[in-house]
Amino acid sequence: MGLYPILEDFRPVEQCNLDYCPERGSAIDPHLDDAWLWGERLVSLNLLSPTVLSMSREAPGSLLLCLAPSGFPEALVEGVMAPSRSVLCQEVEVAIPLPRRSLLVLTGAARHQWKHAIHRRHIEARRVCATFRELSAEFRPGGRQQELGQELLRISLSFQGRPM
């Protein structure tokens, strides 16, 4: 992972392997990963088949400007006629294509403010994914739980290819 500057000091302590099949109705509901234990970066390898990662964020009372479809009148935006309109929205969802054999790093606002999900409709073929997590600052050197963090890292480095 040292090929990518964003992952230069990434030291995973957890690997989660996921195997999804459309026949089983596989999906991941929208969620935020724990921020107390897991660190700033979530790293995921999407293998075997393409899919779509859905990122959503609640935006109560927000106005979303949309381009008006053809046949709709132009809207008055700040005194100027523009081909857009305002729509009150409860949630914003962004669809991110994940090609086969792609690497995804969630960090910053994408990690802490946007929920991520894989909807059933986006599992069209068998999908295998490996997600890696690092420890949060609390469990790293200088953190309140650094001794426990060192033990967790030691255990993770002892993995020999068999589930514990």
Where are these regions (language model features)?
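Non-heme Fe(II) oxygenase metal-center motifs and adjacent flexible, charged/small-residue loops
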Residues: 1-164
